[in-house]
Amino acid sequence: MEEIKYIEPAALHDEMLRLRNEKQMDFLESLTGMDWGVADEGDAPNVTRGLGVVYHLESTVTGERIAIKTSTNNRETPEIPSVSDIWKAADFNEREVFDYYGIVFIGHPDMRRLYLRNDWVGHPMRKDNNPEKDNPLRMDNEETYDTTREIELNPDGTYQTQENVIFDDREYVVNIGPQHPATHGVMRFRVSLEGETIKKLDANCGYIHRGIEKMNESLTYPQTLALTDRLDYLGAHQNRHALCMCIEKAMGIEVSERVKYIRTIMDELQRIDSHLLFYSCLAMDLGALTAFFYGFRDREMILDMFEETCGGRLIMNYNTIGGVQADLHPNFIPRVKKFIPYLRGIIHEYHDVFTGNVIARQRLKGVGVLSREDAISFGCTGGTGRASGWACDVRKRMPYGVYDKVDFKEIVYTEGDSFARYMVRMDEIMESLNIIEQLIDNIPEGPIQEKMKPIIRVPEGSYYTAVEGSRGEFGVFLESHGDKTPYRLHYRSTGLPLVSAVDTICRGAKIADLIAIGGTLDYVVPDIDR
């Protein structure tokens, strides 16, 4: 069980600032909204009640980690100090918590909802929410506003509301998305332009929001597994691996070595699959049609392996609590061993046809620069963070599976531009092949599934587990009250930090470069919207 330190809201901002400056807690790993219910006279002294937030912090300098929580018993006008001035990652995460729970973050410059319509009534993640009563079916479009509100605390203890302008009437604003092939999903960017130069950008999420975290609260633990494949659908193995590990950790279940080997191999095949698709989509975004077909051709080989063993190509439903659903198909190992030298031998053609192309280099080099400090502050992990010089690989920071038994290099570039983000992923394909090669001939015998009770009840407590997804750290925060359903199940999206940084990355760039920058960030919209 995870130890979480409680801090009163009045002291939260000062304590968080101290942790950032004195303890070097520069990485806000996760921020989770909570509803712990109404306070009761019979509650034990250590029981937290009310609406609140759980923060997971990490120091990129010392590796130290800490979890903090705070809460307020005011359910009518819940207020907590914002930490968005300390960590940029808190910007979108606090908007998500406001959307879900109605907690207003004092000092946050943009208190709009993140996923739901701004005219939505109520807050769906509250335990007392009644959606049928509050929200009749609407047949009209949501109005778009160019202003937002900020609530500040005055020295005398009173609150002051001010209006912040997103775009004024003199600005030339264009919409890119939500129905645009280059946004890689239903993502909407409102972009203010001066000629072809981007002045600022407003990202609008929620067009494919399905309420997955809310649905989890009414599902048994085995039922929750199916929804992880629908988040980042290009990282289904990795997503479900994280959730299974979190539940197994909470229940004290140790899976067999065979299962660990299988899960690790599947995760790395998934990474290659995702990076090949990344290559193809980026090439298409820049008009390189020939390169587009290279990635799709070779990715099909991996999807065929998945289909033969797992039964699915994108939605695999393979990992399960205590193991995997089925053993490896007899053809799996021979096909993998054939694929490794094939891709190694042909990857130079990818570079010949696209990487070395003068147009591709001009569109990517020196464009869309994200500094290391901003990457950490926004929480941009994965290839984006490592392209900016931040060694943030979960497989190295917090080894899981059998990553502690293999030798692999963490790919890190320092330029922070679109080309560096591209090269990180291309180099990671080779490292994933190396990892698989070290494991494929050494898979031990053993059970593929531990014996489980018919009804799974996770011990009471709070738990956090993470894996290195294809786009960065995918985390799972679970709070259990000992029931057969989770009290709270929150996913740390790999894509939300990426899209929150788009405004910072794109300012001063050309409008055409927005497409290339989005392609190299490699976000998946259903993972953001959940």
Swiss-Prot record:
Its EC number is 7.1.1.-. Residues 1-144 are annotated as: NADH dehydrogenase I subunit C. Its main location: membrane. InterPro entries: NADH_Q_OxRdtase_suD, NADH_quin_OxRdtase_su_C/D-like, NADH_UbQ_OxRdtase_30kDa_su, NADH_UbQ_OxRdtase_CS, NDH-1_subunit_CD, NDH1_su_D/H, NiFe-Hase_large. It is found in: Cell inner membrane. It catalyses: a quinone + NADH + 5 H(+)(in) = a quinol + NAD(+) + 4 H(+)(out). Keywords: Cell inner membrane, Cell membrane, Membrane, Multifunctional enzyme, NAD, Quinone, Translocase, Transport. Residues 171-530 are annotated as: NADH dehydrogenase I subunit D. It is an enzyme of class 7 (translocase). GO terms for molecular function: NAD binding; NADH dehydrogenase (ubiquinone) activity; NADH:ubiquinone reductase (non-electrogenic) activity; quinone binding. The keyword Cytoplasm does not apply. It is a peripheral membrane protein. PROSITE patterns: COMPLEX1_30K (PS00542). The keyword Cell membrane applies. GO terms for cellular component: NADH dehydrogenase complex; plasma membrane. NDH-1 shuttles electrons from NADH, via FMN and iron-sulfur (Fe-S) centers, to quinones in the respiratory chain. The immediate electron acceptor for the enzyme in this species is believed to be a menaquinone. Couples the redox reaction to proton translocation (for every two electrons transferred, four hydrogen ions are translocated across the cytoplasmic membrane), and thus conserves the redox energy in a proton gradient. NCBIfam families: PRK06075.1. In the N-terminal section; belongs to the complex I 30 kDa subunit family. NDH-1 is composed of 13 different subunits. Subunits NuoB, CD, E, F, and G constitute the peripheral sector of the complex. This is NADH-quinone oxidoreductase subunit C/D. It comes from Bacteroides fragilis (strain ATCC 25285 / DSM 2151 / CCUG 4856 / JCM 11019 / LMG 10263 / NCTC 9343 / Onslow / VPI 2553 / EN-2).
